[in-house]
A protein has these predicted regions:
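Cap/lid segment of the alpha/beta-hydrolase catalytic domain
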Residues: 153, 175, 188-194, 198-330, ...
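Conserved beta-propeller blade repeats
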Residues: 11-30, 56-75, 104-119, 155-175, ...
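Structured, non-catalytic alpha/beta "coupling" segments that mediate domain-domain communication
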Residues: 72-73, 82-84, 170-198, 357
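Active-site-proximal cap/loop segments of hydrolase catalytic domains
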Residues: 277-477
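Beta-propeller blade termini and top-face loops
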Residues: 4, 24, 30, 34-42, ...
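Short loop/turn segments immediately following the C-termini of beta-strands
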Residues: 32, 77, 125, 177
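Structural motif
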Residues: 1, 35-41, 80-87, 128-135, ...
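Multi-bladed beta-propeller domains
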Residues: 1-15, 44-62, 89-110, 114, ...
Length: 477
């Protein structure tokens, strides 16, 4: 038999996906762009039926849904950027029938809802940190009350929903990690409020977490905004104002920078390097308003936030200002290029992975697969106001005759998201302009894509190369 067309999306800004509610009763189709979504549902026992629309798409409105006892539980940003939770009857799911269950809150982002038969977990983000809050149902209806919050003792961490496939489960699994705690899986029992450790990743080499300290602090941006920074260092190697400093950031697409344990980083920490993670605007670390404040015509906030974080770390004694290395990849590579143009004196070494550095030519070429969908993040340069603004920070277009830090640029031949010629032409132009003798390296992986080497050990070789470059430039080896 011929394939049957179930759904077709003609707007190239949108991607489509299919799933099922946790109770298994409904199939769900979703079409979503960066800022807008639309969902349809169909009873799972009627696969040849017609899908029903929940709420028609409207620019800047995103929503997602799950099902329990004849009601859809819908996470929506219709009343505010940080989302709220509503319910709607399956028979009449339109917005006019939505009933609020958790209101929108200015300082708390509702990132996800894990729905079960007897309770649900609201995954939220407050002051840049994840929160997991338990709501228990009073009965078969939607009435529920928040009864507990899972507590996390460390100042900088990541906590997230685990694999929970059973709708009538009595417990809830979640993941936890921090800058000094390896990735762990816990089981939370709503009846007792206790969490039980089920599994923790083993770290070879006699790892002792008590040797390391993690902190969370805030930097003041140029407009007065407080920008969170998470950091980790080895206690017995820390000397105020003397340590090499390594700062990582991303700051785009509303992506909240995950703070987690990485055994590879021990190679740096044990050599006295202080590692810092800057939660700059453009990311989602403080909810969608944080994203809004670092995209489109506010994108330069991303760069000035990062500069403020580095300056605050060095003036506060967390690093030697003459030995600062920075790292970012993809859109984080755009960040690396922009801040290096703005403040080349601030950094000793720059690691830029698959960097989006030729903003103008890429965003003016609508034939590239990601260009049109990306208008919602960067702006459409075919409009003068966006063209002028994007040109003001595009790394390739703002290279100048000046002294630059040591720079390592890495790209991949089969990268379909940031084409290899972007980093290549960036390096070629910079090589003709730079007024110093510091290294400028372009490394092209001839087999990889956007994520770099994927072999079991190949990616470790790439990390070793990065660290060798960093340690050499910071004067450690």
């Amino acid at each position: 038999a011929a394939d049957v067309l179930v759904f077709q999306e003609d707007d190239e800004r949108f991607n489509i996906g299919a799933g099922r509610t946790r109770d298994g009763k409904y199939l769900v189709l979703e079409a979503a762009s960066h800022i807008t979504s639309e969902s349809w549902f169909l009873a799972a026992d009627q696969p040849t039926g017609q899908f029903t629309l929940v709420a028609a798409r409207e620019d800047d409105h995103e929503y997602s849904l799950d099902h329990r006892n004849g009601l859809f539980y819908i996470r929506t940003n219709d009343k505010g950027r940080n989302f709220r939770l509503v319910t709607a009857p399956v028979a009449t799911p339109g917005r006019e029938h939505w009933t609020e269950r958790i209101p929108h809150r200015a300082g708390v982002a509702l990132e996800d809802v894990d729905l079960f038969a007897n309770f649900f977990i609201a995954a939220e983000r407050e002051d840049g940190l994840p929160r997991l809050r338990l709501w228990q149902f009073a009965g078969e209806g939607p009435e529920a009350s928040q009864t507990q919050e899972i507590s996390f003792p460390e100042p900088a961490y990541n906590a997230y929903s685990g694999t929970n496939r059973i709708f009538d489960a009595k417990t809830f699994r979640y993941g936890y990690t921090s800058l000094v705690t390896p990735s762990s899986v816990f089981e939370f029992d709503p009846a007792t409020g206790a969490s039980k450790l089920l599994k923790q990743v083993e770290v070879p080499g006699n790892f002792d977490r008590t040797l390391y300290a993690s902190e969370r602090l805030h930097s003041t941006a140029s407009d007065g905004t407080q920008v969170p920074v998470s950091l980790v260092y080895r206690k017995d190697a820390f000397v105020h104002g003397r340590n090499p400093l390594y700062v990582y950031a991303y700051g785009s697409y509303g992506y909240a920078l995950p703070i987690g344990f990485n055994s590879n980083r021990l190679s740096l920490l044990d050599r006295g390097v202080v590692l810092a993670y800057a939660h700059i605007r453009g990311g989602g670390d403080l909810g969608e308003p944080w994203h809004d404040a670092g995209k489109m015509l506010a994108k330069r906030n991303t760069f000035t936030d990062f500069i403020a974080c580095v300056e605050h770390l060095t003036t506060s004694g967390y690093g030697d200002p003459a030995r600062v290395a920075i790292e970012g990849g993809s859109a984080g590579g755009l960040l690396m290029g922009a801040v290096t143009n703005m403040r080349p004196d601030l950094f000793r070494a720059v690691l830029s992975h698959v960097p989006f550095v030729d903003v103008m030519n890429t965003m003016l070429d609508a034939s590239l697969p990601l260009t049109v969908p990306e208008y919602e993040e960067w702006g459409n340069p075919n409009e003068e106001k966006y063209f002028t603004y994007m040109l003001s920070y595009s790394p390739y277009d703002n290279l100048k005759a000046a002294s630059y830090p040591a720079i390592l640029v890495k790209t991949s031949l089969y990268d379909s998201q940031v084409m290899y010629w972007e980093p290549a032409k960036y390096v070629a132009k910079l090589r003709t302009l730079k007024q110093d003798a510091r290294p400028l390296l372009l490394v092209t992986n001839m087999q990889a894509g956007h994520g770099g080497a994927s072999g079991r050990y190949d990616y470790l070789k790439e990390i070793a190369f990065d660290y060798a470059f960093t340690l050499r430039e910071l004067g450690i080896i």
